[in-house]
UniProtKB/Swiss-Prot annotation:
It comes from Mesocricetus auratus (Golden hamster). PANTHER family: PROTACHYKININ-1 (PTHR11250:SF3), TACHYKININ (PTHR11250). The gene is TAC1. Keywords: Amidation, Cleavage on pair of basic residues, Neuropeptide, Neurotransmitter, Secreted, Signal. InterPro entries: Tachy_Neuro_lke_CS (IPR013055), Tachykinin_dom (IPR008215), Tachykinin_fam (IPR008216). Belongs to the tachykinin family. The lineage of its organism: Eukaryota, Metazoa, Chordata, Craniata, Vertebrata. This is Protachykinin-1. Residues 1-19 form the signal peptide. It comes from the Eukaryota. It is found in: Secreted.
Amino acid sequence: MKILVAVAVFFLVSTQLSAEEIGANDDLNYWSDWSDSDQIKEALPEPFEHILQRIARRPKPQQFFGLMGKRDADSSIEKQVALLKALYGHGQISHKRHKTDSFVGLMGKRALNSVAFERSAMQNYERRRK
């Protein structure tokens, strides 16, 4: 048991001494190295720097297709206002919501009332059965 303790102490002392020797040879302050951005750029290898630039690059607005689908890049506010005026007639825009008995979401078309849902489920079942 005493031999294991002696070996462990010897190992810890030798690692401490080797760490002090490495620290004595390195005269640079660790935190001041990171403040100089030119040294950081030179220290990074070219492929690694390229990967970091690709990660940091933001996509163009035309490249982003959200849940609403592709956006028209050349559409302006004037075109949208003209379209709304044409749809609703001479600038009178109706703010009423036209509610229907179905909802189309990400999971597909769903009925809002249970009677219509049960009826459509039965019709689908009958159709598949034939």
